[in-house]
Amino acid sequence: MKKQLMTSCLFAAVLAAPAFAEDADVLQSRLNQVNSFHASFTQRVTGAEGGAVQEGEGELWIKRPNLFNWHMTTPDESVLVSDGKTLWFYNPFVEQAIANWLKNATGNTPFMLITRNSAADWGQYNVKQQGDSFSLVPKADNGNLKQFTINVTANGTITGFTAVEQDGQRSTYQLKSQKNGPVDDAKFHFTLPKGVTLDDQRQ
């Protein structure tokens, strides 16, 4: 009986693997339809028990594969910019900026996954499609991300995404007023403001 059960489980796993791969291909194909866009977004962070932890809003510019500008305007301003080589994080309140090599940035965060849209990245997840919603669960249980869901239409427009961490904290982003098309490269250049301290970790 145990042998039969094990055989059934293995057979089910073999059948599921191609389905996960096909759904990942659909997701990547949809995202590839729009390689540059601008959108505004709202953010809602809730704790494991569902209580609101933070709400905010901001703007987002993306030009795949490696250019992006994520500007959180409320409740506290912060800026995350990639110029293709360096990843800049700027916090105006503390007057500090941090610089890291983009190639060293983790690929298991929702924003990096969406921006890079790399087959190698998606291959690290079991992807399941339900209409315009794609649920991703890491194959390796060694990170902080428990589950990631992205909503993207058939024409490549991202309407929102949600990340659930291992401790149950949930971050939900709703995108609106998305404008697909060319984005000025100036949006992806970061100039250190006068008087701001730079923590340069590109060593």
Curated annotation (Swiss-Prot):
Keywords: Chaperone, Periplasm, Protein transport, Signal, Transport. GO terms for biological process: lipoprotein localization to outer membrane; lipoprotein transport. GO terms for cellular component: outer membrane-bounded periplasmic space. Residues 1-21 form the signal peptide. InterPro entries: LolA/LolB/LppX, OM_lipoprot_carrier_LolA-like, OM_lipoprot_carrier_LolA_Pbac. Its main location: periplasm. Pfam families: LolA. It is found in: Periplasm. It comes from the Bacteria. Belongs to the LolA family. HAMAP family: LolA (MF_00240). Monomer. Participates in the translocation of lipoproteins from the inner membrane to the outer membrane. Only forms a complex with a lipoprotein if the residue after the N-terminal Cys is not an aspartate (The Asp acts as a targeting signal to indicate that the lipoprotein should stay in the inner membrane). This is Outer-membrane lipoprotein carrier protein. It comes from Sodalis glossinidius (strain morsitans). The gene is lolA.
